[in-house]
């Protein structure tokens, strides 16, 4: 039987021990901060990136991994005897990473199936972890692809931002529907769906977030949940408040992690994401 390996990109928010245990390959995006280039994989320490962003003269710029890095990654895996590679990447609404991955696979002439997760962060982790567990257990390529698609179709990702400033500066505001860019200091909750960020609610103060969450949970209380994760940018207190509210509906463990530099660059401080995978 062949060996299948899972590749993803560093926009994923995942526990380091899971990457190691499941032998997941993470290809890093890059972040430019005041003319200094950082590999995203070197900015994973809690609070490290945010302190750099706060001290920077201008908004950091993120860039997708070079095509050559993907080609090299795939060539190295093939040299190790890997017979199939499944590459799961963040939504093309957020980055051109998926196209770089496809081009790298072509250059390497490697057996790579490149998938659009439709998401990023821990919502992408749901797919990556399941695929890696299945690969380790000896599942076939088709079984893994079917499982990933099923998870994708049952996942929802919601982002709350405390300011639209970074989205405007980073040029992402054009990809957010239904938002006036002049309202920089409103709290906004958006859904990432079908590779588009769609505004759900706008308001002042953190009550905007908790009110939205309470309404969402009540409306969906009849749907059995497979897993929930929360990510945050900066201070964890709001994420922990949201976790407490979710716990009333879901009595299993909830992963709460700081999101990475790629997401923080665009959302700014005080943002969060709630990601739900339904059964």
Curated annotation (Swiss-Prot):
Identification of the protein by name: DegV domain-containing protein SPy_1493/M5005_Spy1226
Domain of life: Bacteria
GO molecular function, one term: lipid binding
Pfam families recorded: DegV
Binding locations of heptadecanoate: 62, 95
SUPFAM superfamilies (alphabetical): DAK1/DegV-like (SSF82549)
Gene3D superfamilies noted in UniProt: 3.30.1180.10, 3.40.50.10170
NCBIfam families noted in UniProt: DegV
Coiled coil: none
Alphabetically ordered keywords of this record: Lipid-binding
Domain DegV, chain residue ranges per copy: 4-278
Signal keyword on record: no
Quaternary assembly: Monomer.
Functional description taken from the UniProt entry: Binds long-chain fatty acids, such as palmitate, and may play a role in lipid transport or fatty acid metabolism.
């Amino acid at each position: 039987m062949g060996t299948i390996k899972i590749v993803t990109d560093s926009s994923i928010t995942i526990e380091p021990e899971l990457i190691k245990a499941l032998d997941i390959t993470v290809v890093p995006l890059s972040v430019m901060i005041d003319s200094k280039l950082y590999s995203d994989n070197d900015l994973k320490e809690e609070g490290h990136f945010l302190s750099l962003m706060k001290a920077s003269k201008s908004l950091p710029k993120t860039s997708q991994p070079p095509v050559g890095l993907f080609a090299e990654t795939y060539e190295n895996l093939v040299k190790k005897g890997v017979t199939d590679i499944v590459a799961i990447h963040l939504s093309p609404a957020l980055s051109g990473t998926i196209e770089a991955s496809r081009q790298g696979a072509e250059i390497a002439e490697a057996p790579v199936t490149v998938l659009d997760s439709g998401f990023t962060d821990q919502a992408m982790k749901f797919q990556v972890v399941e695929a890696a567990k299945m690969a380790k257990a000896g599942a076939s390529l088709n079984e893994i692809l079917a499982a990933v698609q099923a998870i994708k179709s049952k996942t929802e990702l919601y982002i709350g931002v405390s300011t639209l400033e970074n989205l405007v500066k980073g040029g992402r505001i054009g990809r957010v529907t239904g938002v006036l860019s002049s309202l920089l200091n409103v709290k906004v909750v958006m859904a990432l769906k079908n590779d588009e960020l769609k505004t759900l609610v706008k308001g002042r103060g953190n009550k905007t977030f908790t009110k939205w969450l309470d309404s969402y949970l009540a409306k969906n209380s009849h749907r059995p949940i497979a897993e929930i994760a929360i990510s945050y940018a900066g201070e964890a207190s709001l994420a922990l408040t949201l976790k407490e509210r979710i716990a009333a509906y879901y009595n299993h463990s909830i992963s709460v992690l700081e999101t990475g530099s790629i997401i923080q660059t665009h959302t700014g401080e005080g943002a969060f994401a709630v990601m739900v995978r339904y059964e």
